[in-house]
Amino acid sequence: MRQVSVNRLQKGDVLGRTIFSHNGRSLLGKGVTLTQPYIDRLKELGISIVYVDDDETKDIVIEDVISEENRREAMNSIEHSAEAVRIGKDLNGFQVKKTVNNIIGDVLFQEKIFLSLTDMRSYDNQVYAHSVSVCVLATILGKALGLDKDTLEALAVGALLHDIGTVKLPNELVAKREAFTPKENDLYKMHTVHGFEILRNKPELNLLSAHIALQHHEWLNGNGYPRKLSGRHLHVLAQIVGLADFYDNLVNDGPGHSRIVPHEACEIVMGCANKLFSQQLVVTFLKHVAAYPTGCTVKLNTGEVGIVVDQNKSLPMRPIIRILIADKGLAHVRAKEYNLVEDLTTFIVSIVE
């Protein structure tokens, strides 16, 4: 299985992973042979990357950190929570805790965990998919930092609902893809306060989750919002969710900006150490996120093009590459593989989309 830009899809390509709608329903199932109308529809939905199966990469296994069932349930949970608040009802905190404990269970079950899967997002599911991805990444970081089960639960709840306050904002603002005006930006920043007010009144939820919603845009240097907290005044759980949110926003389209590839996002995160986020948190993050996700196509300094087939978790910037295309564009049949930990003179120069 490999990643393919929707713009490079061809009729006859076989979908390698199911694409879901905002409520967790299947839009297009794994194993479907793509037709031109299907490809056109994917473009209309705003999906930029999909996974395909082919003979050259059929042995490449790209596993999600959480099960497909738990990802669907989490999408449903955040949608139902948002809708409940939107119509003036209480969100079901017990259901949210059940959902995040399933995610925690998946994360704790894996001995060595590494995030190497790219989301397939459409315009209609990107808000909920973002919340789920932030929850998964925050839980991975929480486990790596040695948090106990109760604290992990508070972290995961706060991560899944970190943007719940946006339901109190105008729909057209939340759905806007262009850059915010200064006035819109000030209004948007209020989602942190709204989120805190929504969650702090839920007795079944740990108050730490409410503080995550309030503080997830605060930065170590005091230049965040809404209260410009800094240093020791920031809660570590909010910093974890803040970093997960920051990274996920970098690798996905947002208001006024286009997504960047994971290795560029990792470089930006690296530069945020001791400025936006603590050094310890950034180092932990970089040990658990693939700069070059498995299945992506890369170009090497040798001029060759290949697929990332596996990760070297001790050195995430130097994965294992299977060469598919020579420098003159001639296709190979598994001509060779580079383990970049061993081939020290070979390195990746770019991701090919």
What residue spans do the PLM features occupy?
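Membrane-cytosol interface segments
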Residues: 1-97, 326-329, 334, 338-353
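Histidine- and acidic-residue-rich, metal-dependent catalytic cores
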Residues: 32, 75-353
